[in-house]
Curated annotation (Swiss-Prot):
Keywords: Late protein, Metal-binding, Transcription, Transcription regulation, Zinc, Zinc-finger
Domain TFIIS central: from-to ranges: 77-201
Pfam families: Zn_ribbon_TFIIS
Designated name of the protein: Transcription factor TFIIS homolog
SMART domains xref list: TFS2M, ZnF_C2C2
Zinc finger (TFIIS-type): 202-242
Organismal lineage: Viruses, Varidnaviria, Bamfordvirae, Nucleocytoviricota, Pokkesviricetes
Gene3D superfamilies: 2.20.25.10
Matching InterPro entries: TF_IIS-typ, TFIIS_cen_dom, Znf_TFIIS
GO biological process assignments: DNA-templated transcription
Gene Ontology molecular function: nucleic acid binding; zinc ion binding
Function: Putative initiation factor. Necessary for efficient transcription elongation past template-encoded arresting sites.
Residues annotated for Zn(2+) binding in this entry: C206, C209, C234, C237
Similarity annotation: Belongs to the TFS-II family.
Amino acid sequence: MKMHIARDSIVFLLNKHLQNTILTNKIEQECFLQADTPKKYLQYIKPFLINCMTKNITTDLVMKDSKRLEPYIILEMRDIIQMMFFRTLQKHIFFKKHTDLCTEYAQKIEASCYHYTYQQQEKTFLEEYSTRCGTINHIINCEKKSHQQQDNDALNKLISGELKPEAIGSMTFAELCPSAALKEKTEITLRSQQKVAEKTSQLYKCPNCKQRMCTYREVQTRALDEPSTIFCTCKKCGHEFIG
């Protein structure tokens, strides 16, 4: 009973300064769920009370004191990330026509990234979570550069229902973009297998000593549909240049 009264009082104090009932309830509930005793609950909620009363709750403060204020920054960040996914999905005409579905998918995609990150924990949670969300957001963006549009497997499968939004967060790049992953793997394999044997030719003039005694080799440094790059070495002065 005492704990219930204390929680009501804390909610009242927080909301008085934040003027945001939803955010107030989120902060208080997160602190309550993380605490297993009334003492720990008060330890978790104390920083919020102090900073609210002094009007010092800011993003900068949260980052400097991320351990104690982590519930606050995570809740705020998740809302921002969900909006980011919503705006990205709405760029596609399908989601422009289905706003409710767009909202649902944005929330589920963010949640899948959140749960995936929570299980990893190799880096700090916020850093890993932010990185993961940025990667997924790029993958589902329909406004990619022209040469990337054909590789948007994930967005097409999301629209068709083949891919569930709640599963995206834990999937690998190869699972989300099989076409792009296969293309990348093929290019890497081709480059590793290409012949780099040097040949001698008088076709290339050394810009250093002006002689035409050079060895050269062709290397596929760009996309497969673009010409190879020719690396030349002057046999006279040893200068290296691109032919």
